[in-house]
Every structure is written in structure tokens, then in C-alpha cells.
Amino acid sequence: MLFTAHQIQTIREQALGMDKHRQVTPEVLATIYDHRLFHLFVPDELEGRMTSLPEAARIFQESARIDGNLGWLVTIGAGGGFFASLMSREVSRRVFAHREAVIAGSGMPTGTARQVDGGFIVNGSWKYCSGSTYATTFTANAVIEPGFTVQDATGELTADQNQSLIRSFILNPGQIEILEDWNAFGLRATASHTISAVNAFVPFEMTFSLTETQGYENETIYQYPFLPFAQVSFAGVAAGIAEHFLEAAESLATQRGGSSHVVGKLEERKAALEQSVSDFYESVEGSWEELLRNGELSNATEAEITARSITAAQTALSCGQQVFPLLGLSAAMEDAEINRCWRDLQTACSHALLRSF
């Protein structure tokens, strides 16, 4: 187990306050920093703690089992380390090589970039940027305005006349305005706000392409396809929140002298979740072994990872959907632990990558 009993107790004691005030506490952030959880996919030489995907998914699950906000923030923050291989080594060191380094941002290309001498002028807004209030760096995707050129990883200019080119831009907090609009009913403390940039100048070296590796090519995690990587990460969170939900439901049912129907449904959902999570990790570990062996994943393996991730998340979601209505009015109170778990579970499983449609 990664977290100590004292850390788990502290986080859970602060969970209600985080939910009410919609922000993570300094103590919880300090725990994340102490364990270097935002650096699970950052090379060791950049003060990272490079971790295999199967191990990281279990860390995400363990974090989310303690508290949904913790699990989500750890997962999103760690995921930003994936970009270390897409930046130059000098820029990667600048971005990642300190204790509190963490990226927030968005993959949606809802900004524009106009080329100027030495770089780009970036404008736009990007939704759902988890961790926005404590991020040390922001990344955002923007469409290069037609008729301009961009530099590739070799420094050569590449024409962009006939198609929209999307590029990723590295911005510092001083270039970003945070619009505090994350009013979701779950994962309230994740600060998943909209960010905006107005006429922000970004030098060429502070941009990157999601398809061009610039360093750390030998790190296995950077060879893992990004879509299944993200799905595995989010599925781990969903599983952890569902486990916490079932724990809280069992405790509540025991206090209320739950009927055999409620107890039976709890046991049924626990068994279904355990089987689904077991199948999920079997596939994740198999894919990691395949990557180590072959240097790439087959299309069939990628499809299997996607399917197993979605199934695990949907099974996790079903725990809330099938058990929550059986728990009575006490579960409907927003300050109840079970209510918070239920809301977090619904919110996490609403992510587009965890849906089958």
C-alpha cells in the first residue's frame, strides 16, 4: 500500500471540506508531492518516479479508493508527464524538474495560433482543465492559422497551406486566466475550470506536436498509444471510487440493519466489480508485456484495452446505479460519505473515454 494509515485518515477527514469548498487542501497536495505522484511518468533524471502503466493504474485506483478527488487529480497530474518525451530535453527539465511541477490543460483544439517572429500568438479558451488552481505549467492545443509555417522537431520549416494543423502550446500561469466555472455535482475539488489565453506569446521551443518524440525514446511508457493509456488511467480511477462506494454502502447498510435484498445486491456488485477489475488488469499487464517484447501494440491489443477499460468503468458505474437507490434518504444527504462517492462515480464515468457510445 502506497499511503500510510495516517495519510488515509487525514485525507478522508478532509474530504467533506474539500467537497464543500470545491478545492483540494494544502495537506492533500503535500501528500501528493511527497509521494511524487504527479511524476509517475516523468523520467528519473527530471525528479520523476518512472512507473509502469499497470503499477500506475493500481496507484490511481488506490488513490481514488481513498477519495475520488484525490484519485482524479493524481491521474490527471501524472498524465501530463506523458508530454516529457514530446518536448526538448531542455524544456522538459524546465517544466518538470522540481517537486511541485504539474501540468494542467486540455487536448481540445479550441484555440488559435498566429505565427510571428520567434513563435506564435495564442488565443482561446479550454474547458475542464483539472488541477488548474495549482498547476505550474499549462498546455493547450490550438489550430495554426492557415498560410503559415511551423517548425518541426529538427527546426526545419514545414508548410501548412492546405489543412488545419493542430499544435500544443506550453504556457506559464501568468499567461492564463482561470474562469472558475467547474460547478459539477461530483469531483468538486478537482478545479476542472475553463482556462483562457489572450494574445499570449509562445516561443517555438515551447510548442510541440503530439506525434513527434523529441527525447527519452527508450522509456517504455512513451511508446504506449495515448488513447488506451488514457482509458486505462481513467478506468483505474472509476474502479477505486466504486470500491469506496461499496465500502460506504456496506457500512450504511450495516448501521441500518440492511435487508437481505440490499445485502445480496451489495455482494453481487462487489463480485462483478472484482471480476471486471481482474480482467482489466490481466489485459493491461498483457499489453505492457507485449510492448516490452515487440516495441508496439497490435491493433487487436489496443482494441482489447479499450474494451476492458470501458467495461471496468461501466461495471464500476453500475455499482452506484444499482445500489444507491436501495440505501434510503440518509444516502441522499450531500454531506454523507456515500453521497459524495456516488456523485464522484457518476462524474468520473461521464468522461467520453469511458463511454461505449
Indicate residue ranges for each PLM-predicted region.
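C-terminal helix-coil-helix/basic helical segment that borders enzyme active sites and/or dimer interfaces
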Residues: R12, L16-D19, Q275-T311, F324-A332
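Generic structural signal for well-ordered, non-transmembrane alpha-helical segments
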Residues: G240, E267-E274, T306, I310-L317, ...
